């Protein structure tokens, strides 16, 4: 008896992302391995929209392998009344030793727990649920414990947390799966009734499976942000042959900076970028223009500039003024064909609505602004600078626009990147933490790797942008080790 367990794909309404190939691979692999049943344990959709629900169920119903299912919390995001979540409540076929417990609202109801009490002693069932049993209330955990003590349940499997443990699988999401590439588990019941788990991982995603030339081609795009340590950063770049450097600095700088830049250029330098201050309606100190002049003076090949510092609600009424100021303040860069990367922003805990959040937190607004700038100034050097941390720490937008959506929808405009991790601590999210691996929480680079290999992304400098220079050194050394394995 082989049961394939699928969890946590988070498919959005965009079926052109790399998540669809993940689902197709999983279903094909399950059929190839001749599994007896597919067991879906929640969050196969990103929000439980009509479109997402219909697509997932059509895929499952088209499979040659029967399926059972229980919803996850994501299936309730749009329809909290369970309109679509209930469609994922599909009991296991008769004779299959699987009991599904609905934990879409985190805690199982008394009715759900009664399923455990009804199981026969020594039945050897697999308890499959979305929210891990250890997260249940003590009373609910006791019900599961009793079922296991009498042999009614002999194995547990859950998802939700996007990482692997004995009774938890990280799941299918290439943007969120922590600890490795997209995967599913096969739970096989042995003749003695015990269960044995084996994990099946998606091939071709991890750089360790790429050719040496492909790894080198990707890694050569990795650069660093100086984070107010320009001289030390340029020396580090020379030592490690880092081709792309972004200056994060003030208007005043050390007298030896031009010489340090020249030395780096002769050593290995290809792309020098400068992070500019915000484009604002009122800039009495002409700060943006001064930084644009500095970029030209230092010989920068490109600059990074956030989307305008206005709310989403304000934008339509002030966009002409913003376009005019952009042209005036960045005139020297536009005239000299310097690449300009427009960077996305993110919501904050007290600014998440259209009326309060900054413009340029979603895909539509970012694309519109880049295209407006290109049309106004007739300049294809203006493109999109994709900050993956800003995409991830972007509630509630991040629920419907995952990283893979940004790759799919903005990849053709990309001319630069910011790479950093997001940390969740004490109920808050913090940006600009150093990357410590390919598959961290809360950002996994699996989707980025897949999108690059699928041809969705233009090659461009990828600047590591931790909060501190030391953090960027740490991240660079870690990534270098991983790519050289």
Over which residues does each language-model region extend?
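N-terminal active-site segment of His-dependent metallophosphoesterases
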Residues: 1-54
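Active-site neighborhood of phospho(di)ester-bond hydrolases with catalytic His/Asp-centered motifs
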Residues: 5-7, 37-43, 66-73, 101, ...
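Conserved catalytic scaffold of divalent metal-dependent phosphoesterases
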Residues: 9-11, 81-139
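N-terminal pre-domain/capping segments
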Residues: 15, 19, 209-301, 485
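Metal-dependent catalytic neighborhoods of phosphoester/phosphodiester hydrolases
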Residues: 17, 42-61, 76-87, 136-142, ...
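Conserved beta-sheet core of the metallophosphoesterase superfamily
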Residues: 58, 137-195
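Active-site acidic/histidine proton-transfer and metal-coordination neighborhood
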Residues: 120-121, 281-383, 393
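Histidine-acidic metal/acid-base catalytic patches
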Residues: 205-223, 230-238, 289, 293-301, ...
